């Protein structure tokens, strides 16, 4: 199994705490013969091979979700945070470019981007800085196929507030109203997906959390709503629909 993969997965790097992993990867690329390896202004790890006029960007992300997992190999399977999402693809990029080496007319740029699991700050910086001829994004969609696109992710907080009422009152609580709103959102999404056979074309909805409380004067309830958007639904369209439902 690749030393790059094992070494990279061994560097615990949840979003916002990637620096140690970034420094490790920069040194790893240097040792593999990259012409340049450095940390860019956004904190991304960058390795450059070749100086040709045609540029290929191989972009992965070096951060992970939180929750450290002991790194171990069992029966040819590597366990550890980020082994799949997405240090596996990133390590493949690093080793593949090192194996290919310098090619006449080409420049390969491998980037381990930061903050992907948050606001994609690393990738946003890359999008502004580079204008490559080709870009390949490393994500866990199996080794034997190529994904042509990914859904966008849209998050929203739906907040319900109302005056405090006596607990024996028939008035609905803020929490009850929030539940009604959630059921209406689900009903809309179910109707939208009814004739969509491909998952890629569907709206994928999740209730990421719900909080409620009161201060003696006012009740409040918050729905934390997540959605994976198909191509035909822009973030603006989705947020407008949510506001309409509310």
Model-derived segments and their meaning:
Residues 53-112, 130:
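Active-site metal-coordination/substrate-binding segment of hydrolases
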Residues 41-42, 60-62, 114, 138-141, ...:
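Fold-independent oxyanion-binding glycine-rich loops
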Residues 7, 95-102, 180-187:
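Short glycine/serine- and small hydrophobic-enriched flexible loop segments
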Residues 10, 14-20, 36-38, 154-246:
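Metal-dependent amide/peptide-bond hydrolase catalytic core
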Residues 68-69, 144-148, 210-215:
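Short beta-strand/turn micro-motifs at beta-sheet edges
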Residues 91-155:
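Acidic/histidine-rich catalytic neighborhood of metal-dependent amide-processing enzymes
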Residues 63-65, 115-117, 163, 230-232:
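Short coil/turn motifs at secondary-structure junctions
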Residues 1-57, 65, 220-227, 237-241:
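N-terminal helical capping/dimerization or prosegment-like subdomains
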């Amino acid at each position: 199994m690749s030393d790059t993969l094992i070494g990279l997965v061994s560097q615990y790097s949840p979003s916002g705490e990637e620096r140690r992993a970034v420094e490790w990867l920069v040194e790893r690329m240097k040792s593999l013969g990259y012409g340049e390896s450095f940390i860019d202004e956004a904190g991304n790890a960058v390795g450059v091979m070749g100086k040709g006029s045609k540029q290929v960007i191989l972009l992965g992300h070096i951060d992970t979700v939180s929750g450290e997992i002991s790194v171990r190999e069992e029966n040819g399977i590597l366990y550890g945070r980020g082994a799949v999402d997405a240090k596996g693809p990133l390590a493949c990029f690093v080793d593949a470019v090192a194996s290919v080496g310098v090619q006449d007319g080409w420049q390969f740029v491998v980037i381990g981007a930061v903050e992907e699991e948050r606001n994609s700050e690393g990738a946003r910086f890359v999008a502004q800085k580079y204008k490559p001829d080709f870009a390949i994004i490393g994500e866990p969609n199996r080794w034997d196929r190529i994904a042509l696109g990914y859904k966008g992710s849209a998050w929203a907080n739906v907040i319900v507030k109302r005056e405090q009422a006596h607990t024996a009152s028939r008035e609905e609580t803020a929490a009850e109203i929030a539940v009604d709103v959630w059921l209406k959102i689900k009903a809309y999404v179910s109707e939208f997906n009814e004739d969509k056979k491909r998952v890629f074309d569907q709206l994928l909805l999740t209730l990421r959390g719900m909080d409620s409380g009161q201060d003696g004067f006012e009740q409040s309830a918050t729905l934390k709503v997540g959605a994976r958007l198909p191509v035909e639904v822009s973030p603006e369209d989705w947020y407008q629909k949510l506001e309409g439902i509310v």
